[in-house]
Amino acid sequence: MKQMSYVTRWLYSTSHKDIGMTYLGFGMLSAMMGTGMSVMMRMELSNGNSQFFHGNNQAFNVMMSGHALLMMFFFIMPVWMGAFGNFFLPMLMGAADMAFARLNNISFWCLPPALVCMVCSVLMEQGAGTGFTTYPPLSSMSAHSGPSVDLAMFAMHLTSMSSLLGAMNFMVTVLNMRTMGLHMVNMPLFAWAMFLTAMLLLLSLPVLTAAVTLLLMDRNFNTGFYEVGAGGDPVTYEHLFWFFGQWWPTNYVNNLEYCAMCWETYNKMYFIMLLITMYMSTNLLANMVKMLMTNRSNQQVTKNRMNKPHALRGDTSPKVRHKMFMNTMSKKSHALRRDTSLFSFPKNDKVRHMYDMNSKRYKSYLMGTSETTSTKSLKEMNMPSQRTGNPAITGTNLKENKNTMENSFNQWLAGLMDGDGCFGITQNKYTNCEMTVALEDEKTLRIIQNKFGGSMKLRSGAKAIRYRLHNQKGMINTMNAINGNMRHSKRLVQLHKVCSLLNMPVLEPMILTKNNSWLTGFFDADGTMNFSFKSSCHSAGGYTSKGKVSNHPQLTISVTNKYLQDVLPFKEMLGGNIYFDKSQNGYYKWSMQSKKDILNFVDYIKLNPSKTVKLNRMLLCNLYYDLKDLKSYMLNDNNMLQNKAWIKFENKWNKKF
């Protein structure tokens, strides 16, 4: 008799054990590929800068999508159902094999072509960087025009076909292939898990396949199922996908739980029945919950439109409908009204400020999937504008305030770069920027680092810290932020060179006004602020806290620069004087000593706050002039309390914040 070859033994087999082991090997191969993608993503995210993809965000998204699809459709489902189910289910049923042995072989051979399509999807052109849910319009032809997304969808079709064939085989095996005397109630819980999983696969996978088919038609046949301009609705795909997606995580986790419980409670029949009932109800609810939520939302939107005639317009956006739904729900919920009363303090500026800041910080959060982000501000949840009567905390003004804060930060950053920063180009044509500040201003650099990336390092031999940014993505973001806000003559030359290398146009420098934060950033970098006593031997003089004979104190604010044209706008806007200092190769100093000019500058800083410790001294200026008018710096028996106040002021002034 001719011996069976290795290929025939494993690839042509209809034995449930052989096919189960083949499923297991295929799943391990897919798992290794998915693990490789996971390692790439973890290497990229191991540091704030780009470590592996060199700023290529599309490549990262492709790895994320490929990793998720491989792990779900090519590892978890084939191993749990194909490998363990095929191997153990017939033995637990007392059956010789599966009900349809050749169908079992066909269901496996749908997977290798699907894996080839999945790998080609990752490697071809720009890849499918849509996330594992492939939501439109990100997966539509306008966003991903190549064949990568089509190949990913073909892979999902083939895996769905494999799962459907396997599900039919499992269900028939459980129903018809049990040994004599083995009733459904007496089956092991593992068999129940396989049976219910197969049943739900049979119900949910056609819905997912239909959703993917409609998306393929939109991409290749110019239909408009998910195109808003053609009368379609992209949210329909979300509902169809999660009819399947809401089910599978719960199902596979339950397999582990109930299989473990099976061995502990095998002899307790009533507990077995309870677990079976719980298992069936849990899986049924997991399959129905998305449909019930969608139905509830549609009913609420319909009711809102009937109550509000202006909402019947056809161009009402989903965001507007979402706001209408949330406002109606908040009006009907007494508990929500009771909770929102805690935030209704229109006269309390501190509470209003806290609400303003928190609403900007926690304005949005993830809903459901890795790609769907839903904006649900605090105003929509529990603080409508008609309840508080305060227009300063409505959603529109929050957005305007956010844009204003962003522009102010960019102007301040440009001023800081003009003062203490520099741009450079390496021999390999890589761009970078550096910035050096005092050691006590480390928090300032942390703000910049959190926004743009980069690294910080202490300077040896100096009480200063240096910030360095060298990755391309961070440099592009920095250039976009400060372009058009730079004013320093030398920095503008460097900016032109860097922007030329990055293929970015250079905008004209902005005009310096009191509503512009550039001077604040420049003062944080190159400005000084101190007061001194003019020594005198006059008998009417007094003693400072340091015991020196002195005249009245003099407060001075100054900014230095090498170029006269850079400091002239300071004098035109805020007054003061400019003189040339020959020390240190010569530089121009803009300084002010008069009370009027200094308080004018303090008002400017309050309007455009400093982000360094210099702000602490700036806020002490009014106290300085109050104590100076009272001559608190004079040491005599008549003003001991005032002199103590002056000493306390000096301690605050010299404190290292």
From Swiss-Prot:
Its EC number is 3.1.-.-. It is an enzyme of class 3 (hydrolase). GO terms for cellular component: membrane; mitochondrion. It holds the Pfam family LAGLIDADG_1. It comes from the Eukaryota. InterPro entries: Cyt_c_oxase-like_su1_dom, Cyt_c_oxase-like_su1_sf, Cyt_C_Oxase_1, Homing_endonucl, LAGLIDADG_dom. PROSITE patterns: COX1 (PS50855). GO terms for molecular function: cytochrome-c oxidase activity; endonuclease activity; heme binding. The mature protein may arise from proteolytic cleavage of an in-frame translation of COX1 exons 1 and 2 plus intron 2, containing the aI2 open reading frame. It is a multi-pass membrane protein. It is found in: Mitochondrion; Membrane. Coiled coil: none annotated. The chain crosses the membrane at residues 19-39, 69-89, 103-123, 152-172, 188-208, 269-289. Residues 246-657 are annotated as: COX1 intron 2 encoded. One of its GO terms (biological process) is mitochondrial electron transport, cytochrome c to oxygen. Residues 1-245 are annotated as: COX1 exons 1 to 2 encoded. Its main location: mitochondrion. Keywords: Endonuclease, Hydrolase, Intron homing, Membrane, Mitochondrion, Nuclease, Transmembrane, Transmembrane helix. In the C-terminal section; belongs to the LAGLIDADG endonuclease family. Mitochondrial DNA endonuclease involved in intron homing. PANTHER family: CYTOCHROME C OXIDASE SUBUNIT 1. This is Probable intron-encoded endonuclease aI2. It comes from Debaryomyces hansenii (strain ATCC 36239 / CBS 767 / BCRC 21394 / JCM 1990 / NBRC 0083 / IGC 2968) (Yeast).
